[in-house]
């Protein structure tokens, strides 16, 4: 089964770093995406806020460069996580992160 997502946007919630009891580092943040997409011959505004989690040692170094306002592209897979309140939310599990040069 295919499960791949690439999403570019701006980090809109500060990264939260934790280490699991088994020693695996995790970094969580929220990515806001805004764009214009073409659908059925018409332009439409596309917008979402996607929770992102980065797990493992491989990508942790780049997460230290990520702050609110950072523009990035994230590639990975999506999965549902159940919150403490019982509601499910879609989460992007990052496998590759690229900082987008702002040109400043």
Swiss-Prot record:
Could you list this entry's UniProt keywords, alphabetically sorted: DNA replication, DNA-binding, Primosome
User: What Gene Ontology terms for biological process does this UniProt record contain?
Assistant: DNA replication, synthesis of primer
Q: Ranges for the SSB domain?
A: 1-101
Q: Name one GO molecular function term.
A: single-stranded DNA binding
Q: What does this protein do?
A: Involved in the restart of stalled replication forks, which reloads the replicative helicase on sites other than the origin of replication; the PriA-PriB pathway is the major replication restart pathway. During primosome assembly it facilitates complex formation between PriA and DnaT on DNA; stabilizes PriA on DNA. Stimulates the DNA unwinding activity of PriA helicase.
Per the record, the similarity remark reads: Belongs to the PriB family.
Can you state the subunit structure given in the record? Homodimer. Interacts with PriA and DnaT. Component of the replication restart primosome. Primosome assembly occurs via a 'hand-off' mechanism. PriA binds to replication forks, subsequently PriB then DnaT bind; DnaT then displaces ssDNA to generate the helicase loading substrate.
Protein name as catalogued: Replication restart protein PriB
Report which gene this protein is encoded by.
Answer: priB
């Amino acid at each position: 089964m295919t499960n791949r997502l690439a999403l570019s946007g701006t980090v809109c919630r500060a990264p939260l770093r934790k280490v699991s009891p088994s020693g695996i580092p995790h970094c969580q943040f929220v990515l806001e995406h805004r764009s214009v997409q073409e659908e059925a011959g018409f332009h439409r505004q596309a917008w979402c806020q996607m929770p992102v989690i980065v797990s493992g040692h491989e990508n942790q170094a780049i997460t230290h460069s990520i702050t609110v306002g950072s523009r990035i592209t994230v590639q990975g897979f999506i999965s549902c996580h159940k919150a403490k309140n019982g509601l499910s939310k879609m989460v992007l599990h990052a496998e590759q992160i690229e900082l987008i040069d702002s040109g400043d």
